[in-house]
Amino acid sequence: DSNTALLWRDMGYRAILIEGIESRFNDLINNTRGYDTFCINNYVQETGDDSIDNILGRSTVELTDDNFVLMSIDIDSFDYYVFGSIKKYRPKVVIVETSSGYTPDRDFVSRNAGCSLKSVAELGETIGYKCVIHTGNAYFVRDDLVDLLPDYDYSLDVIYSSPADIDSRQGK
């Protein structure tokens, strides 16, 4: 499943798509042919030449605070660290995969097994993002845009969806 395909496929958004696994990258190229996408075959690292900032900087797409609408981080391991390493860019919305089996009061961060909602939400606050919903992924809105959202209780225990909640919404 893709967190972004609806946007670039059906709504005409431009996308930079990064895939480290070559066979999946080849599928990505085939699936995005004819759309306004820029595909990059690269593993993302926390620092160095393969940091998210450096990889995005090598694309031909000019990214500004106004036109960088969404970043989705789904690396199946150290999403937390990649989210925390973003320095140059300020997307309006960031989606970060979490290990949803942890309740919203639990701190957990691992390079090999993901992170809890609480841990990534606290990280988001330190880098200027507010966590506003959790569906297995944590959805963050840039601090300067939070006032545009409806008046709602965005506390973690309210926005958290457990694996059972997610399964029931998907008809499982």
Language-model segments: residues:
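Active-site glycine- and acidic-residue-rich loops that bind
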Residues: S72-G84
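Rossmann-like AdoMet/SAM-dependent catalytic core
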Residues: D1-L6, M11, I52-L63, S100-K172
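SAM cofactor-binding core of SAM-dependent methyltransferases
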Residues: D1-R58, D66-V69, I73, S100-Y102, ...
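A structural signal for short, well-ordered beta-strand segments and their strand-loop junctions
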Residues: L17, S72, V93-E97, K130-T135, ...
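A short alpha/beta connector and helix-capping loop motif
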Residues: Y81-A113
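Alpha-helix C-terminal capping segments
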Residues: L28, T32, F83-K87, C131-V132
